Regions:
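Conserved alpha/beta-hydrolase
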Residues: 48-70
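Hydrolase active-site cap/lid region
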Residues: 114-169
Length: 248
């Protein structure tokens, strides 16, 4: 279904040609769907189908340095937040009246949260962030400690290199700081058994968010598995949240 129904679309962002799949539906509701680290848009096919069946037009995007998009470096959401603005612009070129929700899983969740702190068009009505991390720095420290690898001074050096080469360090790449500025209603989702992005980050992000907000905890769900572990709870919560901000 995904391969048959989707139309390839492209934007240029930061001089990179980025790829997405567009799934046309009637009406002006759009879901912009963002995958996780080292994944690709087509791995989000289940989410795409859910939104499509609910009547949404769907745009599933390959993040820079993933899938069919150009790029040599994965930015963990920070440069990617600008790419999200580019995709929103493309949607508005198709339909100036578009009502857009941003949905991301893992790094995709961090990306849409980082984007939410920017000045986005009023067309963006809601954000759904499934197991996003607080910042690139926090995530790397968590992973190092989980693997019992000393993170100092390697992480500090890598962060400095990123600052020199790419213009930002790992602490700047912060969803936590961005949600403090967000005015877009946000649903935070996290599984209690997430070992890759710790469950405690849900609480930190939720507390920091300045926007209207809700949170969903999925008991027993590991990383990025909330929708598989309890699909009924996941999608009924998403459905209610969406209806609140863009109607049924």
């Amino acid at each position: 279904w995904y391969a048959d129904e989707g139309e390839d679309v492209y934007i240029i962002s930061d001089s990179l040609r980025l790829h997405g799949k567009r799934f046309k539906n009637s009406g002006s509701d759009y879901a912009l769907v963002c995958h996780g680290y080292t994944s690709k848009a087509k791995h989000m096919a289940g989410f795409v189908k859910k939104f499509y069946d609910r009547g949404f037009n769907v745009l599933a995007v390959d993040a820079r340095a993933h899938g069919d998009s150009e790029g040599a470096k994965i930015g963990m959401g920070w440069p990617e937040r600008r790419d999200i603005a580019g995709w929103i612009k493309l949607i508005l070129s198709w339909d100036p009246d578009a009502r857009i929700i941003l949905h991301g899983v893992s790094m995709g969740a961090a990306t849409v949260l980082m984007a939410s702190g920017e000045t986005l068009p009023e067309n963006v009505k809601a954000v759904i962030a499934d197991c996003g991390y607080t910042s690139e720095w926090d995530e790397f420290i968590w992973e190092a400690e989980t693997l019992h690898i000393p993170w100092f001074p390697v992480l500090n050096a890598a962060s400095l290199l990123s600052k020199l080469r790419d213009g930002y360090d790992f602490k700047q790449a912060s969803a936590l700081d961005q949600v403090k500025k967000s005015r877009i209603p946000t649903l935070f989702i996290h599984g209690t058994e997430d070992e890759l992005v710790p469950y405690k980050m849900l609480g930190e992000l939720y507390l920091a968010a300045a926007c209207e907000k809700e949170k969903l905890t999925v008991e027993g769900a590991g990383h990025a598995l909330s929708s598989s572990v309890d699909p009924e709870l996941y999608w009924s919560t998403v459905e209610r949240f969406i209806e609140k901000y863009i109607g049924s």
